[in-house]
Amino acid sequence: MKKRWRHTSRLTALAIALAASAALAGGAAKDTNDSAPMAPEASCMCLWQGGFADVQATTDLVATVTVVQGKGNSLDLTVDTILRGREYNETIRLWLQARDYCRPEAELFPAGSRWVMALQRITDTVPGGFDPLTPNISYGRIGDYTLSSCGGYWLQLHDGRVTGNLVDAPRWEHEPKMTPVLLELLSAYIRGEVNREALQEASREDPALRELMLDTSEFLRDVR
């Protein structure tokens, strides 16, 4: 009788422990599901749309810009040259990564840096997109712009040349190895004056071979 009681007690204790464990697991799952939609670290889900040459035509504004300053997930940009589209303000606001928005981090664009960007204008209010308690962390305001991370929507601009995911570069690689391409050539492509192959050829040139050709030309001039 004593052994049977001990056996029953152990089974009862085991059942209580299993029930408690299941309850904790269920509660944890509920907490995770409730917090997931608003988790700031949640990553976005999108398909790669292509390099700059492919995506620029689908956006509202393509321009060379200079970063003035940043606050939260926003940047203030001066519009230096408009390559396609219209914008009458000299300074525009760009909203970048926050929550699960498919946008690059603001830290990638330091003050003073210059870029060629293909931007989308915000035209609709998004429910929950603005929190008055954190006004510098937002989806963005109507009339401002966003920059997508789902393609090569930006190129770095330095000394009149651009680098980045321009044409046929690896997916999700925003700083591929390439030869810097003249901004004038990119502008001509956007205007439809040169084709995609011209951008490909310019970005794939061997810098060493180009330097050798320049040296050879100078040598021939000196000989003459």
Predicted feature residues:
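Structural detector for short beta-strands of small beta-barrel domains
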Residues: 58-77
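OB-fold (S1/OB) nucleic-acid-binding surfaces
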Residues: 73-96
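N-terminal post-signal-peptidase region of extra-cytosolic proteins
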Residues: 46-53, 94-105
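Netrin-like (NTR/C345C) domain of secreted extracellular proteins
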Residues: 26-34, 102-224
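Short boundary/loop segments of OB/S1/cold-shock single-stranded nucleic-acid-binding domains
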Residues: 36-59
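Bacterial N-terminal signal peptides
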Residues: 12-22
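Bacterial N-terminal signal peptides that target proteins for export
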Residues: 2-12
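Extracellular secreted precursors and ectodomains with disulfide-bonded cysteine-rich loops/domains
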Residues: 42-44, 100, 148
